[in-house]
Amino acid sequence: MSLQQILNSRSWVLFALTAALLTAPALAEDPRQLATLEPAAQETLRTEMRGQLITLNRIITLLVANQVQEAGEMAEKELGRSAMGKHARQPFEARPGPQMPREMHQLGITGHLTATDFARVAASGDREKALAELPKLIGVCVACHSSYRIR
């Protein structure tokens, strides 16, 4: 089959349309604000975000198992005020906080403080109250990830 026959074939048209449809979302402009961070800070932040996602999953798993106080302890240790500043001893180029736009950094701080609020409620052992607090915590995550990107 010649190149001209391939280009004129229905298979080629279907392939081209499929390729265009699959790549269109990737080519669409991302409306989130780009936070320009040094590569080392990007890696630090991405590693931290993956860890926090795992922690949120563990917290939800603990709540399902009615281990509410344990969920609160984990939230405070891994996400709360206790987790703030853990990158302070790293070289500047690896520290995401000081390189973030001010509003993005403030959302991060709000996330830590909201995790501490969740932990305080969970310390009571009242699962319903803890579950009622959880959307506030996850809502801060959603707000930041919906507003900012690092690539």
Residue ranges of model-derived segments:
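N-terminal secretory signal peptides that target proteins for export/translocation
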Residues: 1-9
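Sec/Tat signal peptide C-region and signal peptidase I cleavage site
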Residues: 24-28
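Sequence context surrounding c-type heme c attachment/ligation sites in exported
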Residues: 29-151
